[in-house]
């Protein structure tokens, strides 16, 4: 890793045991080819494009940051967290675009608790599994865009969107890598703890400020979010706040034991959110990994 990247990450409060900001990792797949190191620069310009597409009978909104360059570029498809929207982790998205990497950010059907959501659907109709289908459809649409390099499609997700990203990656092919921010692997366990009896689940209830419906519970009640992580064939980089009390760091540590090719970066003095400064710095590192290989 270049000195500039290391300095940025040190400023971000990321713990490191070996100078690569890795706190835990499985064995890595050996490199078979040696490519010239690409120096990441984030001074490029980009164009914002908007899209709509259908998924599960609903019209969904997506926004893309597209670098102003010739030819096809790597593409990152972003999945937001519970109640958020396409603007979630926006500085990560912008930083990637300025580094020459396109970002396609969808708003899930019923996924936003905004008073003016951009996608159709009610929050009470949304679940992790409906979002998995939305993401599958987004991958199909986005990977065929004229500026996207189909051999360099990456997935990125925050919180519930991180869980959705991992579950989706278990079922799709040709994904080059995953970047997950405090992924909600603990969600099914939390649901079972909150509702010991499935037949006593209410029709609607409030979860972290978002009104959700019974389908949200029933769709993941029997899920083991960790069970198939060992089937992921692409590298995974997880970022998780040390002081996260919504999705504890232990959830990602548990996931690391199942993942074959993964890296966990622990963020000091960080809870269940990233500051704009952290987002920009993490976007810089993700760009470095996309250009120079996930470590």
What is each residue range found by the language model?
Residues 167-213:
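Hydrolase active-site cap/lid region
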């Amino acid at each position: 890793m270049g000195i500039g990247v290391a300095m940025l990450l040190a400023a971000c409060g990321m713990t490191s045991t070996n100078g690569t900001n890795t706190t835990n990792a499985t064995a890595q797949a050996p490199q078979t080819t040696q490519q010239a190191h690409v120096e990441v620069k984030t001074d490029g310009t980009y164009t914002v494009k908007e899209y709509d597409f259908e998924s599960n009978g609903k019209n969904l909104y997506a926004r893309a940051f597209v670098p102003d360059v010739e030819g096809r570029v790597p593409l990152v498809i972003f999945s937001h967290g519970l109640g958020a929207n396409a603007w979630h982790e926006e500085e990560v998205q912008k930083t990637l675009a300025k580094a020459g990497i396109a970002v396609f950010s969808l708003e899930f059907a019923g996924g936003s608790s905004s008073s003016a959501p951009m996608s159709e659907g009610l929050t009470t109709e949304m679940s992790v599994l409906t979002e998995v289908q939305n993401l599958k459809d987004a991958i199909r649409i986005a990977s065929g865009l004229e500026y996207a390099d189909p051999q360099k499609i990456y997935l990125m997700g925050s919180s519930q969107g991180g869980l959705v990203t991992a579950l989706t990656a278990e079922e799709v092919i040709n994904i080059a890598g995953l970047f997950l921010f405090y992924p909600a692997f603990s969600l099914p366990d939390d649901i079972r703890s909150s509702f010991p009896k499935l037949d006593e689940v209410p029709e609607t209830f409030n979860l972290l400020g978002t009104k959700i419906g019974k389908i949200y519970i029933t769709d993941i009640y029997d899920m083991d979010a960790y069970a198939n992580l060992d089937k992921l064939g692409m590298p995974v980089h997880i970022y998780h706040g040390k002081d996260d009390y919504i999705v504890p760091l232990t959830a990602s540590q548990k996931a690391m034991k199942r993942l074959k090719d993964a890296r966990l970066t622990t963020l000091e003095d960080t809870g269940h959110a990233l500051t704009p400064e952290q987002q920009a710095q993490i976007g810089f590192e993700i760009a470095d990994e996309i250009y120079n290989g996930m470590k």
